[in-house]
Each structure stands twice: as C-alpha cells, then as structure tokens.
Curated annotation (Swiss-Prot):
GO CC list: cytosolic small ribosomal subunit
TM stretches of this protein: none
Subunit composition and interactions: Part of the 30S ribosomal subunit.
GO biological process: translation
Protein's name in the database: Small ribosomal subunit protein uS17
Originating organism: Chlamydia felis (strain Fe/C-56)
Keyword terms, alphabetized: Ribonucleoprotein, Ribosomal protein, RNA-binding, rRNA-binding
C-alpha cells in the first residue's frame, strides 16, 4: 500500500517569543494546573524550538506539532497561525 499510517503526533498552542533565526522560532507554551498538595493554581511555561515555514513573527499565536529531529534542538514544526 502506498499510504502509510503515521502515529498520532502531539500538538501544542503557544506564543512566538523569538523569530531572529532563519527558519526557526522559539514558542512559549503555558500550562496551568492545580498543585496536587496545596491546591494552588500554578502557571508554568516551557520553550520549544520549532521549524518555521509559515514566516510567523514575534507575538503571534501558533500551533506546533511534533516531528522527527530536525537539528540539535528542533523537534517541532509550526503547523498553523492562530489569530
């Protein structure tokens, strides 16, 4: 068969914080959760290096998707621009 079935790939939504590199952006993804013991709402963020084919710029909200390793740090790619 010509069509291969790929596994489900993770997607995340975040804000572009840096687009100074060629074809690469840094996306900050925020996570809000309740602390298991103290029940306080905690806001946590993490940065992901993503491949940028859509030429998004800083401040834009984007959806990124997991992909094969593209470089030492890049394992995500920008799939779509959200607003």
């Amino acid at each position: 068969m010509a069509s291969e079935v790929r596994g489900l790939r993770k997607t995340k939504v975040g804000v572009v914080v840096s687009s100074k590199m060629d074809k690469t952006v840094i996306v900050r993804v925020e996570r809000v959760y309740s602390h298991p013991q103290y029940a306080k709402v905690v806001r946590d963020s993490k940065k992901y290096y993503a491949h940028n084919d859509l030429n998004v710029s800083e401040g834009e909200k984007v959806r990124i998707q997991e992909t094969r390793p593209l470089s030492k740090l890049k394992r995500w790619r920008v799939v779509e621009r959200i607003s």
